[in-house]
Amino acid sequence: MLSDIEIARAATLKPITEIAGRLNIPDESVLSYGHTIAKLDGEYLNSLSSKPRGKLVLVSAITPTPAGEGKTTTTVGLGDAFNRIGKKAVICLREPSLGPCFGVKGGAAGGGYAQVVPMERINLHFTGDFHAITSAHDLLAAMIDNHVHWGNEPVMDRNSITFRRVIDMNDRMLRNMVIGLGGKANGYPREGGFDISVASEVMAILCLASDLKDLRSRLERIIIGEDNDHNPVAAAKIKAAGAMTALLKDALQPNLVQTLEGNPALIHGGPFANIAHGCNSLIATKAALHLGDIAITEAGFGADLGAEKFFDIKCRQANLEPDAVVLVATIRALKMHGGVALADLKNENIAALETGFANLARHAENLAKFGVKTVVAINRFHSDTEAELDKLQDLCASIGLDSAVCTHFTDGGAGAEDLARKLSAILDAPKEDSFRLLYPDEMPLWKKIETIAKEIYRAGEVVPQGTVLKKLKSFEEQGFGDLPVCIAKTQSSFSADPKAKNAPTGHIFPIREVRLNAGAGFIVAISGNIMTMPGLPRHPAAENIDINEDNEIIGLA
């Protein structure tokens, strides 16, 4: 089989105006970035709010393993499948980050015959949204230190500055540093550091803002530190929000591309789900709901991270109600959760599959707590045996879950038609249950953290470390007690220990740090050793990326 990039390069892409035309978007609202990429005019999208809203489908997954699950691939394949059976579907994805693109994961445009294209441009730079977000974030960082340097009012406590710089790259050397060395002319010495851009509060703000006015208001609310009387200082106090908004004006408009089968895809925003809220932009999701019959979106990593944050943060803030969830699983990953080594996954192992099924069942139980109907998408690999596939479908049925074997990676949308039809039956039928959130706004912050950790991660005890409880009390006293919680933890386990596979229960779940993201509208609670600035692996994917003799990019997967 051809590589992802070879498949993408062989495709004949339609003009982006033709893709927009299928959604009845007028030409003057299509802001082209070449022939195959466009941004959609924000004013036009605002005008859609009075139109009927379609159905919302979330694609999530079991706990990820190195064996791979194929969540983005399934999202793309499902969108193509819906369109093949006569449903007007629009998919919504996050934009790839350069960090993982050159690190472990590689690109994030799907795979095989279920991709969004042009994949090279989408994976590398795209329309410059991440550059704009990084620039706006670091402009605020520069203005903070400049404000302190000149002693402007309000006078800030330089040791209280909480706003770090960002870059869209995996670089462990930038995590912690001393800045401002070299004498008074070069600033003032203090500890600082960088996070990856996808962990930026500005990224989260762009993805949760409803329009440009809301974006500016949220930027003003970013807490950057304290004054000398220990009162919180917001970005509005140093007059940074206006220039930041100017940098983000175009980036706020969602990007329109196409799948290999010529169906519309909105790709916009890119917060990670392990260190941020993990969902594409609200503006893109709402646009898809008004432009199509069905909007299909994905949330990062496993359902314990992406889906919970999609429900409790994005849906809470935007008053959205999902109509169905797809839980993506693979035989390979479930066998790995059942104790099989990566090198042995090609061998049939029914016993390990049965053991690892506990992970899928746990995610399904958690999703049921939100009142949303779930269908399992079994993303088939060539090494899967018929006996294993039959066993997994039987296991799903035994706990009341419908499932569909999907081959969209090799067959495109045709390979996900069974999944699309099963979802259509759910979407067309009256709801059996009502959507609900995991906790109410008025619940105390620590109780919210405990609720997520015990109800979703199945922790036995949640342990606050250091000044966590003191900070949470301070946040509540400052009027932020009604905010939802975004827990940053490893994506590799329900617990804080990435080595604890399958479905651990009764574990100790530590909270080592909490951060206030007042602009984004949530509290970040950091657990375990999760880093907001990743590092590169021993042999990063960047080693395999190059330009060939025809000036074409190679090695991008």
Curated annotation (Swiss-Prot):
Keyword annotations: ATP-binding, Ligase, Nucleotide-binding, One-carbon metabolism
GO terms of biological process kind: tetrahydrofolate interconversion
Organism per entry: Zymomonas mobilis subsp. mobilis (strain ATCC 31821 / ZM4 / CP4)
Gene3D superfamilies: Domain 2, N(10)-formyltetrahydrofolate synthetase, Formyltetrahydrofolate synthetase, domain 3, P-loop containing nucleotide triphosphate hydrolases
A single GO molecular function term of this UniProt record: ATP binding
Catalytic activity, EC: 6.3.4.3
Top EC class of this enzyme: ligase
Disulphide-bridged cysteine pairs: none
Signal peptide: none
UniProt binding sites for ATP: 65-72
InterPro entries xrefs: Formate_THF_ligase (IPR000559), Formate_THF_ligase_CS (IPR020628), P-loop_NTPase (IPR027417)
Family membership: Belongs to the formate--tetrahydrofolate ligase family.
Protein name per Swiss-Prot or TrEMBL: Formate--tetrahydrofolate ligase
Alphabetized Pfam families for the sequence: FTHFS
Pathway: One-carbon metabolism; tetrahydrofolate interconversion
Parts of the chain that traverse the membrane: none
Superkingdom per UniProt: Bacteria
Highest classification ranks of the organism: Bacteria, Pseudomonadati, Pseudomonadota, Alphaproteobacteria, Sphingomonadales
Catalyses which reaction(s): (6S)-5,6,7,8-tetrahydrofolate + formate + ATP = (6R)-10-formyltetrahydrofolate + ADP + phosphate
